[in-house]
């Protein structure tokens, strides 16, 4: 059984059966009992890009379908959580470092996993404290040159962000020099 939204069969509001019906410019899942429309929206992911001189902090995924692949430290926004608070929380969980979350560097739709569509927001970050150590979803963390990111990359959108940074389309700030 798939948990992707188009495969939902029952209404989360009342338990009634869902049917696909035209609504606006597309087909939508509509409850046959309470008539609620189930809007299928992507999850929001956040990432913090931290620079040390000409290097970026990366983390290697320790499990799941992207095990062994590298990514900019990232995670999901919880219900009711501010995106910057989520970015700082996820960064701390994955790297052991507290960060000041700054400006938005990039926003991309992530279609690489059809089971879990997301919109990602990449923020500039500055390390404020802590000890660099892999945690949560990562088994290794380290700084790599912007010109030579680690391979393989878990998420193709991280490559887009790196390309934007290389071209100067996104500005970024530095980590504290002592970190």
What are these regions, as identified by a protein language model?
Residues 1-65, 76-93, 97-107, 111-129, ...:
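N-terminal leader/linker segments that precede catalytic domains of diphosphate-processing enzymes
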Residues 69-75:
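Conserved acetyl-CoA binding element of GNAT-fold acetyltransferases
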Residues 63, 72, 117-120, 138, ...:
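Short, glycine/charged-enriched secondary-structure capping and boundary segments
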Residues 65-68, 142-143:
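A short local loop/turn or secondary-structure capping micro-motif enriched for an aromatic residue
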Residues 1-7, 134-179:
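Nudix hydrolase/Nudix homology domain
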